[in-house]
């Protein structure tokens, strides 16, 4: 599922909203801001859309085992029906996620939101900066950063579950 943060929305909507990037010394204010007030409704609409059915490239039995791994290890952040805590307004500092803070530094909250997982299989590379080429790399990253201590078989099961979403 694509996501429009304020940076993307302003650039894609012809610069008709407020935008700042302290690294570049840019702080643009529009009156009225034609973008910012609409982002919550746009996000709600995007989250209401059903994900396309997953590709037939996952093993259902393995994915079911992976669902159990997910429930134990991942639901702290991926909590609602779309697999994100975004609707709760939760943001995560770069050090919580093990991500480079460069992208987060461009956002208002200087933090990352939890990406929705529905339809995840259809849009690699992963993470805000595209640094994980595969779901295996995503699982390895969070196993290391969150000290999940997953076995190789649990990781494989979790990847199959993610492919099923």
What residues fall within each predicted segment?
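Periplasmic c-type cytochrome electron-transfer domains
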Residues: 1-165
């Amino acid at each position: 599922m694509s996501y429009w943060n304020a940076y993307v929305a302003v650039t894609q909507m012809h610069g008709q909203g407020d935008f700042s990037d302290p690294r570049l010394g840019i702080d643009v204010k529009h009156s009225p801001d034609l973008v910012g007030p609409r982002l919550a409704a746009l996000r709600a609409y995007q989250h209401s859309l059903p994900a396309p059915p997953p590709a037939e490239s996952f093993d259902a039995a393995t994915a079911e085992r992976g669902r159990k791994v997910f429930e134990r290890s991942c639901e702290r952040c991926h909590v609602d029906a779309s697999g994100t805590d975004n609707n709760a307004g939760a943001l995560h500092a770069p050090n919580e996620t093990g991500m480079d803070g460069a992208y987060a530094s461009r956002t208002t909250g200087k933090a990352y939101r939890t990406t929705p997982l529905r339809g995840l299989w259809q849009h690699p590379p992963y993470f805000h900066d595209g640094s994980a080429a595969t779901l295996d790399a995503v699982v390895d990253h969070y196993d290391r950063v969150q000290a999940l201590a997953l076995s190789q078989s649990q990781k494989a099961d979790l990847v199959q579950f993610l492919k099923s979403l």
